[in-house]
Amino acid sequence: MVDIKCGNITFTNIEAILFDKNGTLEDSETFLRHIAQKSARIIDAQIPGIGEPLLMAFGVDGGKLDLAGLIAVASRQETEVAAAAYIAETGRGWFESLQISRQSLDEAEKSFGNTYAPLFPGALELLKNLSITELKLGILSAATTEEVQGFINHHQLNDYMQLGMGVDGNLSKPDPRLFLQACESLGVEPSKTLMVGDSVGDMQMAKNAKANGCVGITWIGRNDNVKGADVVINKLEEIQVET
């Protein structure tokens, strides 16, 4: 077991650390903004006038992405349903609205091909340093498991990660069962596991699962985005192994 120091707090007897992906390890703000804008344009081409309010619902306003907004923190399924609700308000049937939403998001993502957002500064170094200890490392993301695995493969993180888990069914953050499932997959107890994430959902999920601790990271100094965190950091280098 390992002690992890973040700021003035030390988490003791840690066996595993679970990281969120978007906004935590992956600098995905620009990519997600482009996905939101492309999706809104595709839907607006079919239903004129819906584009701008839909873009705001996605969390994009004035060309800027709200890092606590829908497309930044919600699962793919939640994003599909939210977009479908806006479409349904125009008089379309629910199942048709869902289909339009799903197909538009698919088309938007495919238009960017196999593009992956870059790692945040310090992410690779941190994972390398943590992996040489006895810690087990994993990703628990609101993205799909396929997207998580693609991210791990693209950035060549397989040597450091024992788990790449996303949201594929009805469970989504902040449901603590996601965290419990991830811990079970790693073979560790939640009480010996840390969660590192950039959203309130990450913090609530881990807290309700009785995690050892919750580390909130905000690259832009917005502590309210990680309300409930035991400690808030502004860069990954602040996560250190206590020697």
Would you name each region that the model predicts?
Residues 1-17, 30, 45, 124-131, ...:
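Asp-based, Mg2+/Mn2+-dependent phosphohydrolase catalytic module
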Residues 2-61:
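Active-site neighborhood of HAD-like aspartate-dependent phosphohydrolases
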Residues 12-14, 18, 72-77, 81, ...:
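Short, acidic loop-to-helix structural element flanking the phosphoryl-transfer center
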Residues 24, 141, 198:
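Conserved G/P- and acidic residue-centered "switch" motifs that form tight phosphate/ATP-binding loops
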Residues 32-43, 79-80, 101-109, 147-152:
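Hydrophobic alpha-helical core bundles mediating ligand binding, dimerization, or RNAP-core interactions
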Residues 52-108, 124, 128-129:
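A metal-dependent, Asp-based hydrolase signature
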Residues 70, 112-114, 166, 189-190:
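Short, contiguous strand/loop micro-motifs
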